[in-house]
């Protein structure tokens, strides 16, 4: 575990900057600030986003680990500056403040600086205030905010580059449903469809369900409410054998589920047909196999979503995540004032009506990071070229292993071919 791909983030929602750290990437990956900015812009997409998306910009700086557009093999650090920081320098100051100063006292007593003692139901406010012994929610909500996912998206840009350069695969997502909208039930999109998906106001693959999603958001906004939904992440072209069956924490499905559940507001994850599988009989639940004429295996279905026994099986990886409605509800919910114990309504700051389209981009990020870690664990490599050589050697082995011709099987079994033991 010590030398596996690792990532972490630091920073608060209204702090000076967010920081993303990625360790144990191979040298030679091609990643630019423009690549990171592009993914961050995708994270801001979607009908139903709040005003904050309009005036906040993501200022990307590579602090370390990259030179001339290539990773060095050392830890990578990315900083995403907060363009609104001048408005928050006192309230979010890392240094002690002098509240005897009239100007400081005024700023801390009203507006942005006022103590937030009314925790929002569904948010981290209440449990965090009790656990960390804070007298207000500001120290909790600043870190628990989904703004933190911007730093994850930055890290995920490097994971995407690894998957692209080493395996030639891409990660994409689309929105299945929002609220009670008609769900999408068609085939999975191809990566070539991504531009069209991102052009959709709700990141829908099918225009037929797009209108239903938009109507849901309009209705929620009109009634002062918020909405959740379901996103699907799709990855095609993964090799057989990423992950492992040998222990629970090495199962790729467990890692994917944990990574997706770690996204703010995600309350459920399913792989493949997921919960629908529980309603089927065994004879209808599993993906039967046939030997393909040109070698390899052909599946008659992909209900497993590309994972069996904690490992990729060569089929399309398909993972869904369910996002609950945003906790900051304009029509404020009942709560208790933690300063007095009196009945109150939850604090309300600017928020989105629906962030499901953006959640899809964050879900892509987490899937990419988990897959990149699995790739490096299986194939290793201090440089991209070394990792590619290792991948190529393995793929050649798989092709030979699944070549059903009699001669190939004889060679694989160590029998004589052309007068030699191979």
From Swiss-Prot:
Q: Which cofactor does it need?
A: FMNH2
The keyword Flavoprotein belongs to this UniProt entry's keyword annotation = yes
- Catalysed reactions, semicolon-separated: 5-O-(1-carboxyvinyl)-3-phosphoshikimate = chorismate + phosphate
Detail which positions bind NADP(+). 43, 49
List the PROSITE patterns: CHORISMATE_SYNTHASE_2, CHORISMATE_SYNTHASE_3
* Cofactor binding description: Reduced FMN (FMNH(2)).
The UniProt entry, under InterPro entries, shows: Chorismate_synth (IPR000453), Chorismate_synth_AroC_sf (IPR035904), Chorismate_synthase_CS (IPR020541)
Q: Which GO terms describe its molecular function?
A: chorismate synthase activity; FMN binding
Q: Pathway involvement?
A: Metabolic intermediate biosynthesis; chorismate biosynthesis; chorismate from D-erythrose 4-phosphate and phosphoenolpyruvate: step 7/7
Q: Which CDD domains match?
A: Chorismate_synthase
Q: Which GO terms describe its cellular component?
A: cytosol
GO terms for biological process, alphabetical: amino acid biosynthetic process; aromatic amino acid family biosynthetic process; chorismate biosynthetic process
Which keywords does the record carry? Amino-acid biosynthesis, Aromatic amino acid biosynthesis, FAD, Flavoprotein, FMN, Lyase, NADP
Domain of life, per UniProt, equals Bacteria
UniProt cross-references to Pfam families, sorted A to Z: Chorismate_synt
Using the UniProt record, name the top-level EC class of this enzyme in a single word: lyase
Report residues binding FMN. 143-145, 264-265, 309, 324-328, 350
Mind telling me which residue stretches traverse the membrane in this protein? Answer: none
Q: What is its EC number?
A: 4.2.3.5
State the oligomer form and interacting partners.
Homotetramer.
Under the heading PANTHER family, the entry gives: CHORISMATE SYNTHASE
Family per record: Belongs to the chorismate synthase family.
Protein's job: This reaction introduces a second double bond into the aromatic ring system.
Q: What is this protein called?
A: Chorismate synthase
Q: What's the source species for this entry?
A: Corynebacterium jeikeium (strain K411)
Gene field? aroC
